[in-house]
């Protein structure tokens, strides 16, 4: 007998091995119809057809469960393959993973796909779903899978199998009628679960993400549990399109990018004002938190990057240059430079912690296809800081950073923060004991702050685990921004030492920290978060003074000068245009305040105040308006 325990504590007994679907049928036909997969003993997910061969706790996954989304999306990727192979038999399928809010499938085809092809593929998927067919899984011996894909000419599937270790002797093959694909699963048992999907776009990609390899075509899509969720997502995409930082950046004349410098930003005067405002704010954070601001070289001999470990773990993403028979690397990270500053002179344990901060300009050789406005660039500047401390000081330093980061995010208008700990990856420096200590220190610090967090196994940096801060924006999207990482490795590799209380030389612990991360990316996120309607303290132009007629020209200039003297960013609009035209123009430019001056305002020494949201605040004295502006300043 096999006993299956359900989430409500009830039990069902079966004569022998039983599938998830059979358990669902035993409970009721309604549940069986809704069953997508199962979760065994609170662990991994399995297909509805998988057998349970021992006493177990079972949670049946239906479209109501969050876990169902990834299963639906992965199954939709296979459905893309089914449709593509029916329409374009010569195409070769590569790989189709789940991504945030959707999925993609990489395909090799000599014939470039067009928007019309995308529509045809989507229509064929709709037709296949309407056939309401079962998705059938077979565990198949490796040699049989190789034979199957050889017969079908699926060269990329064969390459994927070649990359698997010898321990993989069998794998799951999923049958969508005549189409087959390999996967760990689980997948939906029937295509009726895939109705709420939409193909969104086609882009280029490369095999294994390497530009030296052949180019592929990537079909993106999104899929949800029901039509209502899909419609809500598509509405969010429309909202995001309106907030696209590239469009707003052009309209507001903030920045541009061009072909001669892919992934490198040209900042215009208004955009640079925003940059400087944020930089000054972060500089104040450095100062108030005991950081010494420094500046390190842009290029350093590769020998330093070899010592630091970046050469072995990161060289594919680095730029290099040669001079006088020496090879230099353009820095992709700031940390080795900060260690060099620490190494100038011998430190006592009484000196620790020592905190350095830098607006460090870095360059990384990102694939051209991955570049995206300000959000993914090759040249960027980080609010990068490093803390050199003892093991006993880790918890207090991480705790202080955590509280500091939350205040910064609140000042920039982010209140919904998710905290995650990224744990040791397979490819890493150091021994397991050091990683155990580092991960325990991060958990202890967050426990001291009484916050909840999620753990991400395998997603830490190669030199240490990290805390990540994920911020939700105005339309519900989540962005990963700040990090603090424990690093027991780099100080030792680069010879950083201090003298402890026993007069012994020791390597300090190094904490890598950033609150906003890439300044470019952060500004891109802010543009989209605020939809270009900047809070007054961040706005490149905070106030425009506009006259109604030439009779107020001199008074408008006096108002302008009075506000400039208070340190505000003020322009005048003294053109011979109708005041309604001026109001519309500056409202579209999202200038927070427009001060209209006519004969009445000139006579009374006041200004008529309007906001970019078209709110009329009436007449104010200049001093009253100054007080209002000062109350809105953060830095």
UniProtKB/Swiss-Prot annotation:
Q: What does this protein's record comment on cofactor binding?
A: Binds 1 zinc ion per subunit.
UniProt-listed Enzyme Commission number(s)? 6.1.1.3
Region: Catalytic, residue numbers: 244-535
Q: For Zn(2+), which residues are the binding ones?
A: 335, 386, 512
Q: Which GO terms describe its cellular component?
A: cytosol
Enzyme category, top tier: ligase
Q: Which keywords does the record carry? A: Aminoacyl-tRNA synthetase, ATP-binding, Cytoplasm, Ligase, Metal-binding, Nucleotide-binding, Protein biosynthesis, RNA-binding, tRNA-binding, Zinc
Cofactor(s) recorded in Swiss-Prot or TrEMBL: Zn(2+)
Q: What's the chief localization of this chain?
A: cytoplasm
Single GO BP term: threonyl-tRNA aminoacylation
Reaction equations catalysed = tRNA(Thr) + L-threonine + ATP = L-threonyl-tRNA(Thr) + AMP + diphosphate + H(+)
Annotated GO molecular function terms are: ATP binding; metal ion binding; threonine-tRNA ligase activity; tRNA binding
Q: Which domain of life is it from?
A: Bacteria
The function of this protein is: Catalyzes the attachment of threonine to tRNA(Thr) in a two-step reaction: L-threonine is first activated by ATP to form Thr-AMP and then transferred to the acceptor end of tRNA(Thr). Also edits incorrectly charged L-seryl-tRNA(Thr).
UniProt-listed HAMAP family:
Thr_tRNA_synth
Family recorded in the similarity comment = Belongs to the class-II aminoacyl-tRNA synthetase family.
Q: What is this protein called?
A: Threonine--tRNA ligase
Q: Which organism is it from?
A: Xylella fastidiosa (strain 9a5c)
User: What gene name is listed for this protein?
Assistant: thrS
């Amino acid at each position: 007998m096999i006993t299956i325990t359900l989430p409500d504590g009830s039990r069902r007994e079966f004569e022998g091995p039983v599938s998830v679907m059979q358990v669902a049928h035993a409970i009721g036909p309604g549940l069986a119809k809704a069953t997508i997969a199962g979760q065994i003993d609170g662990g991994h997910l399995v297909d509805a057809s998988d057998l349970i061969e021992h006493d177990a706790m079972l949670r049946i996954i239906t479209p109501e469960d969050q876990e169902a989304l990834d299963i639906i999306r992965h199954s939709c990727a296979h459905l893309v393959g089914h449709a593509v192979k029916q329409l374009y038999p010569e195409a070769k399928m590569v790989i189709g993973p789940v991504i945030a809010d959707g999925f993609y499938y990489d395909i090799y085809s000599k014939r470039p796909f067009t928007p019309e092809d995308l529509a045809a593929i989507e229509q064929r998927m709709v037709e296949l779903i309407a056939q309401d067919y079962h998705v059938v899984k077979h565990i198949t011996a490796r040699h049989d899978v190789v034979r199957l894909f050889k017969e079908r000419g699926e060269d990329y599937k064969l390459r994927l199998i070649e990359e698997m270790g010898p321990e993989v002797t069998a794998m799951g093959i999923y049958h969508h009628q005549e189409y087959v694909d390999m996967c760990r699963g689980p997948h939906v048992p029937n295509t009726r679960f895939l109705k709420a999907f939409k193909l969104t776009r086609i882009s280029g990609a490369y095999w294994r993400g390497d530009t030296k390899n052949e180019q592929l075509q990537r079909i993106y899509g999104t899929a949800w549990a029901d039509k209502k969720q899909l419609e809500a997502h598509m509405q969010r995409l429309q909202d995001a399109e309106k907030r696209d930082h590239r469009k707003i950046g052009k309209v507001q004349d903030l920045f541009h990018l061009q072909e001669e410098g892919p992934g490198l930003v040209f900042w215009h005067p208004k955009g640079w004002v925003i940059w400087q405002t944020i930089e000054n704010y972060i500089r104040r954070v450095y100062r108030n938190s005991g950081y010494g601001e420094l500046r390190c070289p842009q290029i350093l001999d590769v020998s330093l990057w070899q010592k630091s470990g970046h050469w072995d773990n990161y060289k594919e993403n680095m730029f290099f240059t040669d001079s006088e028979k020496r090879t230099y690397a353009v820095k992709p990270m700031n940390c080795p430079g900060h260690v060099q500053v620490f190494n100038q002179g011998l430190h006592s344990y009484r000196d620790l912690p020592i905190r350095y901060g830098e607006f460090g300009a870095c360059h990384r050789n990102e694939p051209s296809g991955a570049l995206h406005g300000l959000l993914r660039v090759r040249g960027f500047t980080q609010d990068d800081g490093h803390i050199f401390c003892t093991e006993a000081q880790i918890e207090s330093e991480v705790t202080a950073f955590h509280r500091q980061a939350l205040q910064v995010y609140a000042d920039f208008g982010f209140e919904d923060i998710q905290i995650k700990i990224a744990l040791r990856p397979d490819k890493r420096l150091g021994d397991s004991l050091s990683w155990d200590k580092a991960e325990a220190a991060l958990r202890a610090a967050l426990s001291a702050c009484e916050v909840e967090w999620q753990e991400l196994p395998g997603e830490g940096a190669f030199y240490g685990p990290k805390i990540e801060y994920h911020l939700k924006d105005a339309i519900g999207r989540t962005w990963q921004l700040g990090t603090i990482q424990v690093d027991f490795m780099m100080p030792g590799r680069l010879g950083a030492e201090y003298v402890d209380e026993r007069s012994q030389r020791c390597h300090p612990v190094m904490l890598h920290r950033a609150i906003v991360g890439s300044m470019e990316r952060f500004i891109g996120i802010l543009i989209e978060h605020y939809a270009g309607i900047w809070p007054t303290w961040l706005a490149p132009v905070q106030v425009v003074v506009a006259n109604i007629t030439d009779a107020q020209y001199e008074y408008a200039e006096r108002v302008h000068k009075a506000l400039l003297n208070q340190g505000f960013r003020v322009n005048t609009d003294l053109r011979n245009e109708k005041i309604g035209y001026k109001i519309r123009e500056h409202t579209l430019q999202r200038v927070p305040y427009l001060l209209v001056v006519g004969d009445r305002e000139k006579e009374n020494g006041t200004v008529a105040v309007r906001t970019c949201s078209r709110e009329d605040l009436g007449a104010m004295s200049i001093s009253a308006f100054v007080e209002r502006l000062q109350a809105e300043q953060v830095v």
